[in-house]
Design a protein with these regions (language model features):
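Residues forming the flavin
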Residues: 1-182
Length: 182
């Protein structure tokens, strides 16, 4: 169990989320035309890979508009991932070394992705806002200095995990049972 955090020059924070030893990257989409990933481990934790989410902090300022703007923001990137994955529910993926260098991946290395129905090697930058791309590019080498092998060149980034937090917040009034959108 570990927690990695990197505070980037662009003001964003990047952190590891939900490390799954001996785990699998799984499909988690709930709507057609979107790709969403998540990670899990079986009880035995004996699969060939470990996986962890890499998360960039966002705020409501990143998706201004009405109360459902966060949902639309999430759907946008899930749709972009669907397109980048080949529009067949394969997930877009990229090797860490290629991601940091800003070039699309064309062949896997020693790490075999676990995502079913499969991955399509590409450039993940099409699936995230520019500030997230830059933040993760900066954070990965820093994480690699903290945990040997974390940012190895042929590790596989499989995207996108867009549901670490709810895109909508419902608050309750302190002295009533009524709810209001926030």
């Amino acid at each position: 169990d570990y927690k990695l955090v990197h505070h980037c020059r662009n003001g964003r924070s990047v952190y590891s989320f939900c490390m799954c030893p001996g785990g699998t990257v799984v499909a988690a989409a709930s709507e057609p035309g979107g790709v969403v990933t998540n990670g899990m481990s079986q009880y035995s934790r004996n699969e060939r890979n470990a996986n962890a989410g890499i998360v960039v902090g966002i705020t409501p300022a990143d998706f201004p508009g009405d109360v459902l703007a966060g949902v639309e923001f999430q759907r946008r990137w899930e749709s972009q991932a669907f397109d980048a994955g080949g529009r067949n529910y394969c997930a877009p993926a990229q090797l860490v070394g290629d991601y940091i260098a800003g070039r699309p991946s064309t062949a896997l290395g020693s790490v075999v992705p676990s995502y079913t129905p499969g991955v399509r090697l590409t450039d993940l930058s099409a699936c995230m806002p520019d500030y997230a791309v830059a933040a993760i590019r900066e954070a990965l080498p820093a994480f690699g200095k903290q945990i040997t092998g974390y940012a190895m060149n042929d590790a596989v980034l499989t995207g996108v995990e867009t549901r670490t937090s709810s895109p909508l917040r419902v608050t309750r009034a302190k002295r009533a049972i009524a709810c209001r959108w926030a």
